[in-house]
Swiss-Prot record:
Metabolic or biological pathway, per its Swiss-Prot or TrEMBL entry: Aminoacyl-tRNA biosynthesis; selenocysteinyl-tRNA(Sec) biosynthesis; selenocysteinyl-tRNA(Sec) from L-seryl-tRNA(Sec) (archaeal/eukaryal route): step 1/2
Protein name, per record: L-seryl-tRNA(Sec) kinase
Entry keyword set: ATP-binding, Kinase, Magnesium, Nucleotide-binding, Protein biosynthesis, Transferase
Binding residue positions for ATP: G25, L26, P27, A28, A29, G30, K31, S32
NCBIfam families xref list: selen_PSTK_euk
Residue pairs linked by disulfide bridges in the UniProt entry: none
UniProt cofactor(s): Mg(2+)
Function: Specifically phosphorylates seryl-tRNA(Sec) to O-phosphoseryl-tRNA(Sec), an activated intermediate for selenocysteine biosynthesis. No activity with other tRNAs has been detected.
Organism: Mus musculus (Mouse)
This protein's encoding gene: Pstk
Alphabetical list of Gene3D superfamilies matching this protein: P-loop containing nucleotide triphosphate hydrolases (3.40.50.300)
The protein's enzyme class: transferase
Alphabetized Pfam families for the sequence: KTI12
């Protein structure tokens, strides 16, 4: 089996067979247990090299904020992006057959945990003293067999998973998603049994916000599988293996249809700023209503004004979700101030009707 795997370690173009698998779901859904079992089975049955990259291990809770508290959401986002950069360093080394060098401007704790994670799975060789060796050698399994890297995290927003897809597309890798579907009550129960449980409110909020893979809406999510957390049958195992094989044998093309890509990027762009837009628009509507009250607009007119402003806000947010109309651009980044500016122009038109009724 391993001999066959070694023979099939490269594609027709000479590039190594590489795949990225996003394993997502709520905290305590059983992702880490599933990932370990999957990796063990693929090594034994397929002869593949498999690396499980658990974000909980590589982005530890021990990364404190400056005042000793846990990192803010903006810091977590920075750490996640840094981890993807480290992953890219490893992928480049595998593809080129070169040594992997430590990147500049790194968070040392994240880098060391990342390297340790690879070493523990026989994907990397390096001395005990990390600082004594700036370059790290790939272990033989990483270059002599098909290699699948399983990224184990909540990935509850579509935009988080899309960043991994972009990395796979950049280097023409296989890509797939496994969503572990577990009842919220079960996750809460398991979480409560952990030595360091998350607050129940955090998991409940994530349960409301989590975005399952949607291949019908997003073409890039077509290699996705939703698995019930209790499903451990042979049929489920074969289905998962089939998905991984399909991804490995059909890597993403580096160059895709530009129109489709612009549309996809626009939707992702809206997802990234949706929460900030919601908060800012709420404050803007509240401030406008206070100003209207100061102008002594009649109560009945205030009611209608509030209805119109809230409808306008809802329309803007829905546009951000759906990726249509004028509030979105075709760039990878959308300036929130542009969205607020567009909203305020329409708000002023609405408000003017009620102010003019006063005079």
């Amino acid at each position: 089996m391993k001999t066959a795997a070694a023979r099939g370690a490269t594609r027709r173009d000479g590039q190594p067979k590489l795949g990225l698998c996003v394993l997502c779901g709520l905290p305590a859904a059983g992702k880490s247990t599933f990932a370990r079992a999957l990796a063990l089975r693929l090594r034994r049955e397929r002869g593949w090299a498999v690396g499980v990259l658990s974000y909980d291990d590589v982005l530890p809770l021990a990364l404190p904020d400056c005042d000793g508290t846990q990192p803010r959401p903006s810091q977590w986002k920075m750490f996640r992006q840094e981890l993807l950069k480290h992953l890219e360093c490893f992928l480049v080394a595998v593809i080129s057959g070169a040594q992997m060098s430590a990147p500049p401007n790194r968070t040392e704790a994240v880098w060391e945990d990342f390297i340790t994670c690879l070493k523990s799975q026989d994907l990397m060789i390096f001395p005990t003293a990390l600082e004594a060796q700036p370059c790290h050698l790939l272990a033989k399994p990483a270059v002599s067999r098909p290699l699948f890297l399983v990224l184990d995290d909540n990935f509850y927003y579509q935009s988080m998973r899309y960043e991994v897809y972009q990395l796979a597309r950049k280097y023409s890798l296989g890509f797939c998603q496994l969503f572990l579907d577990c009842p919220l009550e079960t996750c809460l129960k398991r979480n409560g049994e952990r030595s360091q449980p998350l607050p129940d409110e955090t998991i409940q909020l994530m349960g409301r916000k989590i975005e399952k893979p949607n291949p019908e809406k997003n073409a890039w999510e077509h290699n996705s599988l939703i698995i019930q957390s209790s499903a451990c049958s042979l049929e489920a195992s074969l289905e998962v293996t089939g998905l991984l094989l399909t991804a490995l044998e059909n890597p993403i093309k580096c160059v895709e249809d530009n129109t489709e890509q612009k549309e996809t990027d626009r939707i992702i762009c809206s997802t990234n700023i949706l929460h900030k837009a919601d908060e800012t628009l709420r404050r803007t509507v509240s401030q406008t209503m206070r100003e209207a009250k100061d102008e002594q607009i009649p109560l009945n007119n205030l009611k209608h004004l509030a209805e119109e402003l809230n409808k306008l806000k809802a329309d803007v947010l829905e546009d951000l979700r759906q990726g249509n109309r004028k509030y979105l651009c075709f760039q990878q980044t959308t300036d929130l101030s542009d969205i607020i500016s567009s909203f305020c122009k329409e708000r002023d038109t609405i408000v003017q009707k009620y102010f003019s009724k006063q005079h």
